[in-house]
């Protein structure tokens, strides 16, 4: 069975944050703390190999953890951050969470690890109703597939998941875990819920 300490983790903070008015979401305050700190708090209680994928504010993010940018230009989406994470991290298994989900459970890493089977390429969190495509654990062997996928201009993560041996980890006991704070309205709306 894959153990959490055999994995490394990347916080995805490389997007353009258009719905947040272009503000770097990792540094948007939620409950008096930057969203990047919420993400780090989630992971540091579960694992010790943590990095950040960002395409701006690199110096600021580097104060928190090792930080690297996408290797593909023009913000091709979270898949480019995942590609960079797989290339830059040392472990065979690399996990990913978004920087704007401050309510992820404190057993996220172990639940994803427990879903890994011998031939698994990717584990994706599933909340009982929907897959959560950017809360995932990937094996490095899929790097060539992601390279080809991004090179031909594909961006939809779900299509990549269909090309790989993808399994799902059950998070149905955590109905509010995957709330994303993408806009000022969502920050306000969910501030009291979390």
Swiss-Prot record:
CC terms in the record's Gene Ontology section: cytoplasm
Binding site for GTP: 12-14, 25, 53, 70, 100
Catalytic activity annotation: Mo-molybdopterin + GTP + H(+) = Mo-molybdopterin guanine dinucleotide + diphosphate
Positions bound to Mg(2+): 100
Keyword Cytoplasm: yes
Superkingdom as given in the UniProt entry: Bacteria
Cofactor(s) listed: Mg(2+)
Cellular compartment(s): Cytoplasm
EC number: 2.7.7.77
Key words, A-Z: Cytoplasm, GTP-binding, Magnesium, Metal-binding, Molybdenum cofactor biosynthesis, Nucleotide-binding, Transferase
Any one GO BP annotation for this protein: bis(molybdopterin guanine dinucleotide)molybdenum biosynthetic process
Presence of keyword ATP-binding: no
GO MF annotation terms: GTP binding; metal ion binding; molybdenum cofactor guanylyltransferase activity
Domain remarks: The N-terminal domain determines nucleotide recognition and specific binding, while the C-terminal domain determines the specific binding to the target protein.
NCBIfam families linked to this entry: molyb_mobA
Functional note: Transfers a GMP moiety from GTP to Mo-molybdopterin (Mo-MPT) cofactor (Moco or molybdenum cofactor) to form Mo-molybdopterin guanine dinucleotide (Mo-MGD) cofactor.
Subunit structure: Monomer.
Similarity comment text for this entry: Belongs to the MobA family.
Name recorded for this polypeptide: Molybdenum cofactor guanylyltransferase
Natural source organism: Aliivibrio fischeri (strain MJ11)
Taxonomic classification: Bacteria, Pseudomonadati, Pseudomonadota, Gammaproteobacteria, Vibrionales
Originating gene: mobA
């Amino acid at each position: 069975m894959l153990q959490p300490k055999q994995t490394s983790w990347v916080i995805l903070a490389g997007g353009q944050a258009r719905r947040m008015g272009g503000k770097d979401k990792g540094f948007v305050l939620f409950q008096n703390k930057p969203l990047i700190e919420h993400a780090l708090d989630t992971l540091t209680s579960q694992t010790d190999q943590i990095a950040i994928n960002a395409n701006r504010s690199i110096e600021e993010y580097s104060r928190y953890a090792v930080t690297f940018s996408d290797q593909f230009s023009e913000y091709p989406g979270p898949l480019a951050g995942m590609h960079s994470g797989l290339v830059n991290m040392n472990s065979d298994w690399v996990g990913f969470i978004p920087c704007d989900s401050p309510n992820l459970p404190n057993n996220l890493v172990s639940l994803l690890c427990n879903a890994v089977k011998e031939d698994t390429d990717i584990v994706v969190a599933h909340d009982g109703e929907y897959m959560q495509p950017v809360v995932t654990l990937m094996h490095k062997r899929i790097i060539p597939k992601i390279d080809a996928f991004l090179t031909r201009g594909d961006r939809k993560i779900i299509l990549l998941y269909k090309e790989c041996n993808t399994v799902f980890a059950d998070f149905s006991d955590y109905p509010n875990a995957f709330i994303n704070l993408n806009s000022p309205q969502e920050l306000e709306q969910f501030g009291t819920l979390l």
